[in-house]
Amino acid sequence: MWGLLLAVTAFAPSVGLGLGAPSASVPGLAPGSTLAPHSSVAQPSTKANETSERHVRLRVIKKKKIVVKKRKKLRHPGPLGTARPVVPTHPAKTLTLPEKQEPGCPPLGLESLRVSDSQLEASSSQSFGLGAHRGRLNIQSGLEDGDLYDGAWCAEQQDTEPWLQVDAKNPVRFAGIVTQGRNSVWRYDWVTSFKVQFSNDSQTWWKSRNSTGMDIVFPANSDAETPVLNLLPEPQVARFIRLLPQTWFQGGAPCLRAEILACPVSDPNDLFPEAHTLGSSNSLDFRHHNYKAMRKLMKQVNEQCPNITRIYSIGKSHQGLKLYVMEMSDHPGEHELGEPEVRYVAGMHGNEALGRELLLLLMQFLCHEFLRGDPRVTRLLTETRIHLLPSMNPDGYETAYHRGSELVGWAEGRWTHQGIDLNHNFADLNTQLWYAEDDGLVPDTVPNHHLPLPTYYTLPNATVAPETWAVIKWMKRIPFVLSANLHGGELVVSYPFDMTRTPWAARELTPTPDDAVFRWLSTVYAGTNRAMQDTDRRPCHSQDFSLHGNVINGADWHTVPGSMNDFSYLHTNCFEVTVELSCDKFPHEKELPQEWENNKDALLTYLEQVRMGITGVVRDKDTELGIADAVIAVEGINHDVTTAWGGDYWRLLTPGDYVVTASAEGYHTVRQHCQVTFEEGPVPCNFLLTKTPKERLRELLATRGKLPPDLRRKLERLRGQK
């Protein structure tokens, strides 16, 4: 967000600020624009620009610079990407702007859904799926056009005066508009210029005009996806705002996705205005943190709570930024026997910023509440070792942060600096397991757990991001039991498998052997998340996950080969789900207090699930030392876990009666019944293993034949019996 504010401040002399703004021989009109019948601006003859590739947009902008230099009467267009309003019929006039601008107004809430469907109206719509309620910034369409979930508001073709209207419910100070075109894989629809109207009663309207009294035509989009911001030359106090498309892409339709920037104004009838502000008793830091600010905040938490925190790095990004982790425990830096390890990972996709801020808020909250003596937090930190990785992809985040919350779009910053999607970059162990299962090799020949990395994945020329390798080494170094991967752009919890078992299937229900546990974990988070439990909320984009409790099998949503969830399950002991936290990938700072309240209890409750099921220590019966890498198998579940280096283990299970087996190389297998109840805390299930005669003999031979006296006498008696 600060990237947006800095950009707007820097461009304050300009009326508008937009990335990928259109360029044409007539100011403000995109190449190939179609004029609305009532427009008084002549149609340009420039060939349509039908691509949104960045290098093409930059080339067009450079052309615009050349044109502007030739037109001496026009003001300099400003920095790259600056969108400027157009004054029809008076191209030589210069628009004089007031010195005071209001770039800091937050979004009204079309993208975050704070603006309800009932607050959006339009002059017409091509279909219900293209209605006014779909005119929200960054809204995504379904795979098929023409259904109930298309990717924009689109007016009817015969509508000669189309408009999209937003009701703010109360008077606000409108300061700017962000627009996009239609999200579709089949259509090319976007508005290239528009006018703006305001009203207090939806009956009497006035337009945004320049100092000479002429209507301002704002330049809009030159592609469907790049957000373009236009600031009003003079902020307007009103309740309603209308966007009136004037021109649109040639051969397309007037289609819009939008966000409105507006500042609240004082209401003389509101006696308690402070009651509408969501505060925090813990003085938490509700703002977006770039790399430097994140590091500073983590250091402050560590200094406030040095006895329960430790900061460490698991590696570096491609750009050299460290992947910092905050460890929180009563004995930081130490694995305590019998204490489970749990992690939260955020920022795998750099533009999905909410998870990063929630983890920074969580570490502040845990520190404050521990110092305050909160019993729930105290117990959590004394019985669990927590690891928080707020930014797995810091390079991508810095890109998104620089663009700002409203201009980052849907995908910019998602990938690493190398262009790698980290959630498709882990080794595909699913195919390896499923082929072995089809050949009847599991579990006798091929294990059903801790599958090794494929050879191709470790080759020097393998396309594996340094961020991915850092997390893999982290997974192998610490015996994690439970994890959640925090994403954004939806409101749902997805669980493994993420990859479909049928090759090339786009989606297919593909459960793990631990499907009951994963559904439990997912339901726990979804059931304690306030936004997911809001029965009145509308779907974010094209699927209504509330019909199924806001949880879904990942592969049944869309296949994701090489996901971190699947890799964690098949390569380590750790069970991991993906939490999609919000419809808005990069919510404005104004939204952070509410998002924290939506997720606070869910984050804590999910951490507490690490103590469900059974736990224990597998020891050598003679020495009583823990046995590392012993295999814990549960009858009826074709997925095993192993013990840590001290012999301790944790096996997540839902309530029920289980037959559990412990085995280790050189030891007799031991089996026992373990009953998991709904009582709080794990059920202890310890094992004592006895070495096999073969193992004893191997150890004796290792002592160069020097047998103990008792064993020597037994051997002599056996020889005498012969």
From Swiss-Prot:
Tell me which domain of life the UniProt entry assigns to the organism this sequence originates from. Answer: Eukaryota
Where mainly found?
secreted
Q: Which positions are glycosylated?
A: N49, N200, N210, N307, N461
Subcellular localization is given as: Secreted
Q: State the PANTHER family in the record.
A: CARBOXYPEPTIDASE X1-RELATED (PTHR11532:SF43), PROTEASE M14 CARBOXYPEPTIDASE (PTHR11532)
What is this protein for, i.e. what is its function?
A: May be involved in cell-cell interactions. No carboxypeptidase activity was found yet.
> What keywords are annotated for this sequence in UniProt?
Carboxypeptidase, Disulfide bond, Glycoprotein, Hydrolase, Metal-binding, Metalloprotease, Protease, Secreted, Signal, Zinc
Q: What is this protein called?
A: Probable carboxypeptidase X1
Q: Which parts of the sequence belong to the Peptidase M14 domain?
A: 287-610
List the GO molecular function terms. metallopeptidase activity; zinc ion binding
Q: Which family does it belong to?
A: Belongs to the peptidase M14 family.
- Which ranges does the record mark as transmembrane? none
- Say which species the protein is native to: Mus musculus (Mouse)
Cited InterPro entries: CarboxyPept-like_regulatory (IPR008969), FA58C (IPR000421), Galactose-bd-like_sf (IPR008979), Peptidase_M14 (IPR000834), Peptidase_M14_domain (IPR050753)
Cellular component per GO, a single term = extracellular space
All copies of domain F5/8 type C, residue ranges:
103-263
Tell me which residues bind Zn(2+). Answer: H349, E352, H487
According to the UniProt record, which cysteines are disulfide-bonded?
Answer: C105-C263
Tell me yes or no: is Transcription among this UniProt entry's keywords.
no
What is this enzyme's EC? 3.4.17.-
Q: Where is the signal peptide?
A: 1-20
Question: What is the required cofactor set for this protein?
Answer: Zn(2+)
Q: In which tissues is it expressed?
A: Strongly expressed in testis and spleen. Moderately expressed in salivary gland, brain, heart, lung, and kidney. Extremely low expression in liver and muscle. No expression in eye, adrenal, and white adipose tissues.
Positions of the catalytic residues = E580 (proton donor/acceptor)
Cofactor binding comment, as recorded:
Binds 1 zinc ion per subunit.
- Ranges of compositional bias, category Polar residues: 36-49
